[in-house]
Amino acid sequence: MASSHSSSPVPQGSSSDVFFKIEVDPSKHIRPVPSLPDVCPKEPTGDSHSLYVAPSLVTDQHRWTVYHSKVNLPAALNDPRLAKRESDFFTKTWGLDFVDTEVIPSFYLPQISKEHFTVYQQEISQREKIHERCKNICPPKDTFERTLLHTHDKSRTDLEQVPKIFMKPDFALDDSLTFNSVLPWSHFNTAGGKGNRDAASSKLLQEKLSHYLDIVEVNIAHQISLRSEAFFHAMTSQHELQDYLRKTSQAVKMLRDKIAQIDKVMCEGSLHILRLALTRNNCVKVYNKLKLMATVHQTQPTVQVLLSTSEFVGALDLIATTQEVLQQELQGIHSFRHLGSQLCELEKLIDKMMIAEFSTYSHSDLNRPLEDDCQVLEEERLISLVFGLLKQRKLNFLEIYGEKMVITAKNIIKQCVINKVSQTEEIDTDVVVKLADQMRMLNFPQWFDLLKDIFSKFTIFLQRVKATLNIIHSVVLSVLDKNQRTRELEEISQQKNAAKDNSLDTEVAYLIHEGMFISDAFGEGELTPIAVDTTSQRNASPNSEPCSSDSVSEPECTTDSSSSKEHTSSSAIPGGVDIMVSEDMKLTDSELGKLANNIQELLYSASDICHDRAVKFLMSRAKDGFLEKLNSMEFITLSRLMETFILDTEQICGRKSTSLLGALQSQAIKFVNRFHEERKTKLSLLLDNERWKQADVPAEFQDLVDSLSDGKIALPEKKSGATEERKPAEVLIVEGQQYAVVGTVLLLIRIILEYCQCVDNIPSVTTDMLTRLSDLLKYFNSRSCQLVLGAGALQVVGLKTITTKNLALSSRCLQLIVHYIPVIRAHFEARLPPKQYSMLRHFDHITKDYHDHIAEISAKLVAIMDSLFDKLLSKYEVKAPVPSACFRNICKQMTKMHEAIFDLLPEEQTQMLFLRINASYKLHLKKQLSHLNVINDGGPQNGLVTADVAFYTGNLQALKGLKDLDLNMAEIWEQKR
């Protein structure tokens, strides 16, 4: 056996137990062999640890590791031999919560016992006995195994002589430590008369390495020889396996051929006999039913005659009657299958003809001239078609009508565009071929008239669709009402017939009468039940021709169902409606109710179609940005026209469509974006070219501000004559206050009013306009801060320096905008819905930002004077003459500051600014006096300082508007302690 040639060094001993083997510990059979002395002394400077503990494939294979069970914590804790004294292993340290818990076995695994192996033991025991007997008969194999074990032990002992460093996986002589360990050249020193000993050591080292090489080569050759027999055995087994497969394939092929012959001889003949017998039986049945076939033979020609006169309902009734006879009297006859399928195909053909007829009617109704005043085209034809389709349960005719609506809506727009383009002389249709390109060449008034015409045609189109769908809806409701009445009559009839014990026969006769011919529905209304039975038997004959539908006008039509319909039907031809309703429609109340809902949804869909086509028309015109380039008045006119059309369609169809409204909102957003970007760009250009000098105020801007004071936020109309005579003013007067401003701020106020007026004209963009206006005001604040406080104007417009006058003028402009922010907020608040009042917080943030900017400008003015005081007073000396040159310069600079800002800032702000400047002055003077050790002692120095301070105070209070300013100069002296 192949297993006998295994290279395992562990022999398998037999045991009395058949299924378990005892593994022999190889360590008990290994005879220790002394190894050769190591002639590679270790360098004291090398890594001795790495040399001594290097792994060995031979000696390390029996070493204990952390994976053994005795040092594995889970194995130790799960040891079944756990002593009772060890049960408190965890609880004695960590508490009673840590206790041994029994692991519940998985309920997915079955409980295995020895009984499960009983059958296997019985089957394998005989084989095991034979195997043991064969092992005893072949003792040389055991000898071979012992020899193999002895050889393996000897090989392992030889390999132990090779140092572990040669077994390391990272062994490389280019490593200095490894090289010195293998070839210790430090011991081979020829100096000092030791040459002979070193030569002997070198020779011994060479012999030792050669010995190691021989050991390794011998072991490699031995391993190859051990596995050669297994390799040749595997190849032999492969050839045998291929032979077995080839023989098996031939056997399978032969077996299949035999089975095919058996099937042909024993099965096919019997089956053929059975088929012949079945055919004979069918022929007998056909012969017995030939006369019955003649009774229905005339059905198809009669149907063809009815179809030639478009009597779809009569043809369907005849087909239904014939199928009913086949199912009741000729049921189970296989030879009549072709007749049923032909009738079904004929019925399907009638269905297709009715659908085609309805499609033709829909096309004619929807595409007739819109100037025609007739709401419904051929109402009788429509009612007849709808009843026929309902009878056949072809409820998808509404989808056909919907498709025709889509096509008609496209044609309406196309025809309107063609008519408008043909009326426009500026468009050369020979040069511009595409209709869409021709439409884009229309200017706004022409395009607006075209859109108005399209909306008008769509309104008429929806009115016609609504009238047609109302007729269909009334037919569906009449059928639903008829079903309910029929159900009530059936219940009453069943109660009466139950008393006579012939309810079943009467009901069958009634059903046959109701479903045979058209004339039975209205010409035999007053017949007694006996007459009904007679009529039903007469109609069962195929030779009876169906009565013409002209009998509608007969006065004998007085059945219960028809008379009730005469009072409920809203059709212009009540008789025609009654004929259809009296038929069995085979529709449940839920289906009819769903169909009625679908009709209403189709009306909604018609509105959506018109809106969708209008949206596509708008989008095709908006491709080149035409709608975004409209001015405010043009866009307002367009939006009002679209809103009117939306309201008209909602009134006609009963539901508001959102597509056109969404397109209007989308265009409004684009309009707002363009509106905002244009004005923001304009403001940016104005700021970049602003030199921050006081500008004259034209009269029209003063009128604009005056109108705001009156509570009217709107751009006033220009008065050409009066404007030319009035001269510009130096300042802008707002509610009695004078504002010296730059030209950019005047235009900014006008831009703000344009935003407010746009909100009045287009209320739907109020929130967007509020956001854009907030962005514009923030942009003005930040950009003006960059240009003035950040000195950006020096590079942008080439100013030499940012003067105090520039700063004061910027502050006054910001104050003017802050003055109007509450007015703007109130304007937007009146037009915002209450849910969006939170957006007004933007104005609060803007007001805070503007106030912070104004405060920064004031702080900048104070900082300018503060640096001046620090520069002048640091050189101040208390000596004659009085007033000193330092105080003269200070007063001169204060006068310049006052002259620069007094005409720009209000008097109250000027006073507050100079109070802050004076506080800075006192702080620096106090610091300098403390440095000079000048105190308020009434001495000569104190007198000189007092004279200078008096000069400063007099000059400061002499300035305009600062006479009553409380300077409190006593704070310059240190307080006595």
From Swiss-Prot:
Please give the function described in this protein's UniProt entry.
Acts as a component of the GARP complex that is involved in retrograde transport from early and late endosomes to the trans-Golgi network (TGN). The GARP complex is required for the maintenance of the cycling of mannose 6-phosphate receptors between the TGN and endosomes, this cycling is necessary for proper lysosomal sorting of acid hydrolases such as CTSD. Within the GARP complex, required to tether the complex to the TGN. Not involved in endocytic recycling.
InterPro entries from the UniProt entry: Vps54, Vps54_C, VPS54_N
Q: Which keywords appear in this protein's UniProt record, sorted alphabetically?
A: Coiled coil, Golgi apparatus, Membrane, Phosphoprotein, Protein transport, Transport
Q: Where is the region Disordered?
A: 535-575
Q: Please identify the protein, giving its name as recorded.
A: Vacuolar protein sorting-associated protein 54
For this UniProt entry, the molecular function terms from Gene Ontology, in alphabetical order, are: syntaxin binding
Coiled-coil stretches noted in the UniProt entry, renumbered to this chain = 240-260, 480-507, 582-603
Q: How does it assemble?
A: Component of the Golgi-associated retrograde protein (GARP) complex, also called VFT (VPS fifty-three) complex, composed of VPS51, VPS52, VPS53 and VPS54. EIPR1 interacts with GARP complex and mediates its recruitment to the trans-Golgi network. Interacts with VPS51 in an EIPR1-independent manner.
Belongs to which family?
Belongs to the VPS54 family.
Taxon lineage: Eukaryota, Metazoa, Chordata, Craniata, Vertebrata
Question: Which source organism does the UniProt entry give?
Answer: Homo sapiens (Human)
Q: Which segments show compositional bias classed as Polar residues?
A: 535-552
- According to its record, what are the GO cellular component terms? cytosol; GARP complex; Golgi apparatus; membrane; mitochondrion; nucleoplasm; perinuclear region of cytoplasm; synapse
Mind listing the GO biological process terms from this record?
apoptotic DNA fragmentation; astrocyte differentiation; cellular response to progesterone stimulus; gene expression; Golgi to vacuole transport; homeostasis of number of cells within a tissue; in utero embryonic development; intracellular calcium ion homeostasis
Please state where this protein is localized.
Answer: Golgi apparatus, trans-Golgi network; Membrane
* Record-listed Phosphoserine modification sites: S8
